[in-house]
Amino acid sequence: SARNQRLYDSIQSKTSRRAVPRMLYRMLFVKPVLDTTMSGRVTDESRLLEPYAGKTIGDITIERQQVFDPGGNRLERMANKTHMLTRDRVVRRDLLFRSGDKLDPQLIVRNKQLIRSRDYISDIDVTVLPDAVDSTRVNLLITTRDSWTISVDGGWHSEGRTMVGLSDANIFGSGNKLKFMTNFSRKDFSYGGNMVEYEIPNLLGTFYTAEIGGGRDFYNSTLNMGLRKEFLKP
């Protein structure tokens, strides 16, 4: 179900950052596969859009949905109230098409894959709505479902040195990731310094990821800045 899918996404997001939790996740969970079959045959998403290929894209409406269904249990409703929805402009920043472009089914499918790869989005659907007046024009309704992005991390090192971290992969609904880590000794609870990391996954719409981090721990002081782009990104 969609609820189970979001649960797996949330657990995977929390465990993917460190080797041991990541290994445990892979041992204990098998992520459900998105059902792409119809009558026993694989459904090509782009083929469903072929009737609209070449038509002019008109209005693009973004409908953002919370992590859990509004009718969920009490804990899920509380989580929805705590969670800040991804902003409209953040979703639009990741779109590979604009109003006035010709609809390309393959491009829309690739765009859905791109947006699903974001830590803060668990799913996306694109609905094509034929224009009531102009048969050469279609409007798009893009529906996104947020992921739960707040997580706690920890690390145990030699000589009683410990790290505790808190991160949000969608700080204030911006799509940016902020992580704060503090270090202390388990022996006498002496302070060992703080580290802060900030990541922007799509800097100014360029699809480059900007990263900056700094601070100190028991071992050293650091200041890092980086700019990278994944090979498969636009």
Report each predicted region and the residues it spans.
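Immediate N-terminus of the mature polypeptide
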Residues: 1-234
